[in-house]
């Protein structure tokens, strides 16, 4: 089967936003207009095609990013709908890694919400060109220009309007296209019928002003245009479009458009903008990677003629076909039934079938090409972030970084029958989600699950019951504390067993120093000279220290931000072994850490509360009582905003408290920001409780 669409006519985009900005509705409308769905699914009534897990339909939020293919104006648009809830940032991170461009959806009333900032920062990190779509223009309090200001001030972006709304709130009836200088007015409810008219008389001046701003912004990225513009020559529509595209791809501007997806207004022009201004796979720089054999840097150009290279960005368990691995092809082509190498794990995999996904139904395709996004059936060892490539042409593509979980709960099966099923189910779920971890507590034998927040773990427990029929009791959420040291020390570790039979001998001196937070977390330096510790025993010492760091000395929490330098030691010709040096390394670390002024660290969350003016005092008082540090207070619309840093330990059950304090009118969002030392009196309580 040959390619349906040339690579230049492919768009891989993500739709990203804060919860409730209307992201899933927007995707639904795109699918409707591109002829993929015959009846529009509303999120309100739990029928949206992109939200296909039961939990999503009940909660009205998107949890997993579904990938869908649509067609518009002779282009193929692959869309990934990403979740906007902070507990699921990993899904967003994953999607952005494999996209070429994105549409950021903002609510015209709320503007830039905290989650929009997080997602925007993630997109900045990957240098993703994006369009901003200001949605919900029909809502009371809709303000397009305030949305533009917030994109500029809160996100530090350079927003440039390429459309203006005609009216707002219930008078929102169309848009003015600043490129063509025409007005598009919608006639029917489905928005498929619209007419192009002249600009309304009361908007002529405003349109001129914003068109000038647009021309100025795009002329800056093109010298020839700049000359034409300065000499007062009229620029053609085509020239303006090319210039907008160029500036958008260079991430110099963010074109801003508007609409109301729910009322079906503005979605077709959003599709036009995706095709006109967002990159094709051929517009983005070649993907970087490393050759695993030589360690040298390598790259793949987006072309069918290059060797095959793809990145698996999501694993899902499907009730019908088993394990599905979603992947993005960066170069080359792949036929179903062929073999590829998982270069990250060094294992050969057979691709059984290749499926093209449409939110929750699928079609089987014989072959994928560069730039495609599809799902493979039959990959046994592949997990999120792995590279799949041609066996003759090895490369490992740059993977993704995932944050450590910050909250954990003990979970136990209700019956013996549930016990066996629970193990299998949890391992499948942790395969799907790299921020969800499962471990067994050595002291109590309990199974501990850890994740990014209360909602994250709630949904996991819910899925256990629905998908895997496992009934489980869940303990109270616990905070993932960590430990570190505050001063540098030198310490000795000596492990000697020499009474009869083969002896053991390992002896080391190490220096421990605190590292800055936010860095690598652990660093090992070998300063052995003259072979006092033979080379083959260096790595075991490192491993011994790493193992000892897993169980901190204050309360058994993981230790972080430590640099260990091995600088002296001794060995025995006969009795020394890797095991002996591993134990010596671990002993030296424990001895040193005791003396290095160890402290307990706790996760601090950035909390943003939005409340009506009259509850402001209560909310601030409450945050202070939770050991919160108020950072700033501001206004958004007619509500007040309080930003604070609060320890996670004090935030359990906050949703209920806030509801009762503000009679249900306050909302909040929180996300993990950093770790900080626990105040001494509180740390003593935590340590005593752990040692019980």
Swiss-Prot record:
BP GO terms, sorted: ribosome disassembly
Domain tr-type G: 8-282
Gene3D superfamilies linked: 3.30.230.10, 3.30.70.240, Elongation Factor G (Translational Gtpase), domain 3, P-loop containing nucleotide triphosphate hydrolases, Translation factors
PROSITE patterns: G_TR_1 (PS00301), G_TR_2 (PS51722)
Keyword Coiled coil among UniProt keywords: no
GO cellular component terms attached to this protein's record: cytoplasm
Annotated GTP binding sites: 17-24, 81-85, 135-138
Domain of life: Bacteria
Compartment(s) where it occurs, according to its Swiss-Prot or TrEMBL record: Cytoplasm
Keyword GTP-binding: yes
InterPro entries: EFG_II, EFG_III, EFG_III/V, EFG_IV, EFG_V, EFG_V-like, EFTu-like_2, G_TR_CS
Alphabetically ordered keywords of this record: Cytoplasm, Elongation factor, GTP-binding, Nucleotide-binding, Protein biosynthesis
Signal peptide (from-to): none
GO molecular function: GTP binding; GTPase activity; translation elongation factor activity
UniProt similarity note: Belongs to the TRAFAC class translation factor GTPase superfamily. Classic translation factor GTPase family. EF-G/EF-2 subfamily.
Protein purpose: Catalyzes the GTP-dependent ribosomal translocation step during translation elongation. During this step, the ribosome changes from the pre-translocational (PRE) to the post-translocational (POST) state as the newly formed A-site-bound peptidyl-tRNA and P-site-bound deacylated tRNA move to the P and E sites, respectively. Catalyzes the coordinated movement of the two tRNA molecules, the mRNA and conformational changes in the ribosome.
Protein name: Elongation factor G
Originating organism: Desulforamulus reducens (strain ATCC BAA-1160 / DSM 100696 / MI-1) (Desulfotomaculum reducens)
Gene: fusA
């Amino acid at each position: 089967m040959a390619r349906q669409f040339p690579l230049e006519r492919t768009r891989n985009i993500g739709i990203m936003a804060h919860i409730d900005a209307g992201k899933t509705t927007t995707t639904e409308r795109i699918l409707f207009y591109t002829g993929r769905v015959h009846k529009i699914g509303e999120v309100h009534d739990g029928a949206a095609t992109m939200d296909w897990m039961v939990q999503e339909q009940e909660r009205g939020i998107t949890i997993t990013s579904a990938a869908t293919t649509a067609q518009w104006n002779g282009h193929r648009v692959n869309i990934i709908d990403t979740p906007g809830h902070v507990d699921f940032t990993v899904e967003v991170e994953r999607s952005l890694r494999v996209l070429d461009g994105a549409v950021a959806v903002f609510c015209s009333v709320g503007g830039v919400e905290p989650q929009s900032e997080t997602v925007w920062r993630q997109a900045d990190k990957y240098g993703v060109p994006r369009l901003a779509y200001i949605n919900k223009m029909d809502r009371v309090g809709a303000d397009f220009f305030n949305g533009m200001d917030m994109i500029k001030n809160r996100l530090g972006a350079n927003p440039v309007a390429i459309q203006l709304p005609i009216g707002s709130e219930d008078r929102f009836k169309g848009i003015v296209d600043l490129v063509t200088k025409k007005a598009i007015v919608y006639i029917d409810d489905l928005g498929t019928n619209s007419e192009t008219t002249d600009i309304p008389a009361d908007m002529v001046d405003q349109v001129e002003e914003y068109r000038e701003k647009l021309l100025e912004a795009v002329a800056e990225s093109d010298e020839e245009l700049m000359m034409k513009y300065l000499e007062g020559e009229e620029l053609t529509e085509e020239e303006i479009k090319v210039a907008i595209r160029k500036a958008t791809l260079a991430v110099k501007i963010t074109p801003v458009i508007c609409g109301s997806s729910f009322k079906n207004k503005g979605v077709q022009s959003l599709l036009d903008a995706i095709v006109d201004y967002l990159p094709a796979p051929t517009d983005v720089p070649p993907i970087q990677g490393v050759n695993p054999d030589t360690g040298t840097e390598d790259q793949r150009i987006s072309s069918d003629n290059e060797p095959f290279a793809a990145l698996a960005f999501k694993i899902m368990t499907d009730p019908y076909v088993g394990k599905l691995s979603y992947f993005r092809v960066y170069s080359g082509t792949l036929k179903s039934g062929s073999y590829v190498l998982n270069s990250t794990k060094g294992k050969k995999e057979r691709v059984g079938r290749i499926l093209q996904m449409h939110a929750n139904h699928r079609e089987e395709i014989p072959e994928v090409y560069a730039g495609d996004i599809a799902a493979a059936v039959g990959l046994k060892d592949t997990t999120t972030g792995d590279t799949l490539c041609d066996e003759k042409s090895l490369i490992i593509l740059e993977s993704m970084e995932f944050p450590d979980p910050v909250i954990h709960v003990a979970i136990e099966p209700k019956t013996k029958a549930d016990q066996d099923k629970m193990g299998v189910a949890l391992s499948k779920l942790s395969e799907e989600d790299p921020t969800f971890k499962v471990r067994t507590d050595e002291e109590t034998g309990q199974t501990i699950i850890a994740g990014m927040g209360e909602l994250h773990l709630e949904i996991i427990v819910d899925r256990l019951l629905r998908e895997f029929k496992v009934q489980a009791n869940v303990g109270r959420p616990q905070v993932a504390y960590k430990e570190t040291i505050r001063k540098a020390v030198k310490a000795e570790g000596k492990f000697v067993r020499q009474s009869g039979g083969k002896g053991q001998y390992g002896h080391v001196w190490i220096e421990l120093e605190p590292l800055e937070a936010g860095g690598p977390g652990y660093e090992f330096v070998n300063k052995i000279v003259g072979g006092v510790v033979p080379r083959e025993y260096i790595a075991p010492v490192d491993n011994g220290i790493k193992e000892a760091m897993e169980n901190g000395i204050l309360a058994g929490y993981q230790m972080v931000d430590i640099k260990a330098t091995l600088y002296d030691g001794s060995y025995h010709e006969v009795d020394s072994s890797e095991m002996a040096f591993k134990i010596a390394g671990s002993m030296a670390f424990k001895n040193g850490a005791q003396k290095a002024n160890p402290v307990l660290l706790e996760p601090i969350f950035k909390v943003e509360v939005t409340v009506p003016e009259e509850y402001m005092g209560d909310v601030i008082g409450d945050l202070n009582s939770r050991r919160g540090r108020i950072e700033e207070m501001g206004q958004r619309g007619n509500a007040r905003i309080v930003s604070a840093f609060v320890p996670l330990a004090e935030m359990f059950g906050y949703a209920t408290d806030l509801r009762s304090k503000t009679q249900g009118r306050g909302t909040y969002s929180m996300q993990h920001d950093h770790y900080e030392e626990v105040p001494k009196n509180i740390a003593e309580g935590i340590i005593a409780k752990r040692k019980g």
